[in-house]
Amino acid sequence: MKVTLLTHSRLSDEVKSLLQDKIDEYNVTDAQVASLACIRSCYSYKTGLEVLNDEFDKYFGEKGKEGTRLMNHIVKSGHTSTLENCFYSFAVEGVSRALLAQLTRHRHLSFSVQSQRYNKFSSESRSGGFDYVVPHTVKDEWVDSKLGKNVQENPLITFEAMMEEIQRYYDILISLGIPQEDARAVLPNAACVN
């Protein structure tokens, strides 16, 4: 798996120029500043800019416990939509569909995922076939099989053989004119996505 930061929350040049000295003094991120403005805008009669001008020291200064208290309050109260103004975009490569299924359960994350509908994963395509993730429990070692007495099997060899068979059947479906959006039904949860 490879993860690369593409972009993240950034204050406008106008706001940055107004607050640059304080941002440098307290060593806070643009995301922290944006969060303060958004959170306090919900609970104050002041505008976001007024909050930043008037309350910056209170929340980020030497007595910055107010900032910690405020964040804890927001999380405990479930008012986390105010934190959605902070964003980070990552390029994530080589993770399984199974991992993707777990990640997409989280409301605060948004995804743009390599499509198995619009991309061919046949051996003859530009992709050269589908890549896959081998679970860490699938080891390259010989173990006694529970399927028969005096039989040993290698989990890694078995796993890789299954991936080759799935690739072969996917290729057959594509060669029979089945659209990739339907042929993808045979691809495993171990198939990589970016």
What role is predicted for each listed range?
Residues M1-N194:
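Family-specific signature for flavin-dependent thymidylate synthase
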